[in-house]
Curated annotation (Swiss-Prot):
Catalytic site positions: 37
Organism of provenance: Bacillus velezensis (strain DSM 23117 / BGSC 10A6 / LMG 26770 / FZB42) (Bacillus amyloliquefaciens subsp. plantarum)
HAMAP family assigned to the protein according to its UniProt record, in alphabetical order: BioD
Positions contributing to ATP binding: 12-17, 51, 112-115, 202-204
Protein name as catalogued: ATP-dependent dethiobiotin synthetase BioD
Classification lineage: Bacteria, Bacillati, Bacillota, Bacilli, Bacillales
Gene: bioD
Keywords: ATP-binding, Biotin biosynthesis, Cytoplasm, Ligase, Magnesium, Metal-binding, Nucleotide-binding
This enzyme's EC code(s): 6.3.3.3
Length: 233
């Protein structure tokens, strides 16, 4: 299996839920899976409800919180902005150095970005630049409702123009009683973007490890997804 990068059309679209669910589902199928979320803003990485803690718990990796998330910032802002407020900076070389230390600890890694694909992570580099530097294909998480066609298309086209391989799209957060927009958007997104919809996942009323894993296993063909990660360009 190849490692891959989970990015999104925006913040709050469900990248962590999707990443955690995939990690648990892959592990259930005996995959040797690791997780890497290099940046975290607004909450300590060791907090039991942090994205880092959830990723660690659901992947069951032996990597420490510090290895999973080497850079954390106090303010819930874009990493570059949050770092500047603390008088700090993280270079692309810093991130890649941490990645080099852990990338051979597991057969496959799910790497999660921060916010959308164009969020600034440091001076002169964005999430997209990190994806390129890591030489990973991307999975794009998007929301299901009105406006998502535009945001998703722009994200996919931008990724393609950057030379990033897009494995597919996961539409996350569909309501229990979906509106007409949520019913019609997936087919339009797939037609316009010309990349596969890997899954359409519902909005969780209660977020727990069990619910996340069950949701992913129910709404995404995990075996096909794993096969997709084994295919090169």
């Amino acid at each position: 299996m190849r490692s891959f990068f989970v990015t999104g059309t925006d913040t709050g679209v469900g990248k962590t839920i999707v990443s955690c669910g995939l990690a648990a589902a892959f592990r259930q199928k005996q995959a040797d899976i690791g997780v890497f979320k290099p940046f975290l803003s607004g909450v300590p990485r060791t907090h039991p409800e942090s994205d880092t803690s959830l990723l660690k718990d659901m992947s069951q990796t032996a990597l420490s919180h510090e290895e999973i998330t080497p850079f954390e910032w106090k303010e819930p802002l874009a990493p570059y902005t949050a770092a500047m407020l603390e008088g700090k900076s993280v270079s692309m070389a810093d991130v890649m150095a941490h990645w080099s230390k852990i990338k051979n600890r597991h057969e496959c890694f799910i790497v999660e970005g921060a916010g959308g694909i164009s969020v600034p992570l440091g001076e002169n580099y964005l999430v997209s630049d990190l994806i390129k530097a890591m030489e990973l294909p991307a999975v794009i998480v998007t929301r299901p409702d009105l406006g998502t066609i535009n945001h998703t298309y722009l994200t996919v086209e931008y990724a393609k123009n950057m030379g990033i391989e897009v494995l597919g799209i996961i539409i996350n957060g569909v309501r229990s009683r979906p509106g007409l927009d949520e019913k019609t958007n997936p087919s339009m997104i797939e037609t316009l973007c010309k990349v596969p919809i890997l899954g359409i996942t519902p909005k969780l009323d209660h977020v727990s490890s069990e619910n996340i894993q069950h949701m992913i296993e129910k709404h995404i063909d995990v075996s096909s997804f794993m096969n997709l990660t084994q295919m090169g360009r």
